């Protein structure tokens, strides 16, 4: 399928640089294929769903994946910016570095400065391997929980490029870029649809008889990458690690058997649930990597409703929502959102999507 079909123009002023406060005051666009759109607030969510429905959120926790350091040794010590993108093992990470041309295999990086070091001193890493487009493998001097703490001490929130290019991350982002469900560390980007939830909204959902179930998918930096191929068949999807517990799978299967719906909060929950489901729609316990790439024509097995933010043009995420509710439906919904001043991307507003009848398995 041609990727230019998923392109659209977005005025820069539509990009949210800060989240709504309080979080559940964000706007919510209800999208029903073949019915139309309605303007709501996230606080209206309980009334837009039914008793017995089950909401599924991602409880991954964003790490402070943005590191600033310098190459040590040699005749100069150039400044290097590093974004951690995927853990390899207890001491090694895949990362994106800038400027990559300043680094070679075997170089050593030192993070922090005289006024900012972790408790154990300097955090060093060697460049173990160098790939394309600024990607490297870094082997850190620390291991396991000690390394995790050092990264937390020295790192900053890894804001998406469309925010970071317009302002620097600050202390407010430490809390803003984390969902209330965040528990299991490992993401380098937030599961942003979950940012809209508050304890008050959670209580209102419970009072309506709507459950909230949890899974974990560690969101990678690939979520921000545009699709550069001219055809979706030629795009290589990034891989992310996730897990669906036996308890969550059982609860969701029982709910659907009784007529309840599975409501995926965000593309990460959606992709993991679809990866865990059998062809007949039974959700199985799952632990491992998923590189599922969902485009129009995909038959959804596990998810009936989706809550998600507004996505970048020509992104795998816009392709996913187009597969779920229909490309024409989503193009019309996004045009409405732009005209009505909805806020886009990670800190922006949300939409509640119902599945196109033709997208069911």
Curated annotation (Swiss-Prot):
HAMAP family per record: QueA
Any single GO BP term: tRNA wobble guanine modification
Keywords for the protein's UniProt record, in alphabetical order: Cytoplasm, Queuosine biosynthesis, S-adenosyl-L-methionine, Transferase
Record InterPro entries: QueA, QueA_dom1, QueA_dom2, QueA_sf
Domain of life: Bacteria
A GO cellular component annotation in the UniProt record: cytoplasm
Keyword Cytoplasm: yes
Reaction equations catalysed: 7-aminomethyl-7-carbaguanosine(34) in tRNA + S-adenosyl-L-methionine = epoxyqueuosine(34) in tRNA + adenine + L-methionine + 2 H(+)
Location of this chain's protein in the cell: Cytoplasm
Disulfide feature: none
UniProt name for this protein: S-adenosylmethionine:tRNA ribosyltransferase-isomerase
Family (UniProt): Belongs to the QueA family.
Organism phylogeny: Bacteria, Pseudomonadati, Pseudomonadota, Alphaproteobacteria, Hyphomicrobiales
Pathway it works in: tRNA modification; tRNA-queuosine biosynthesis
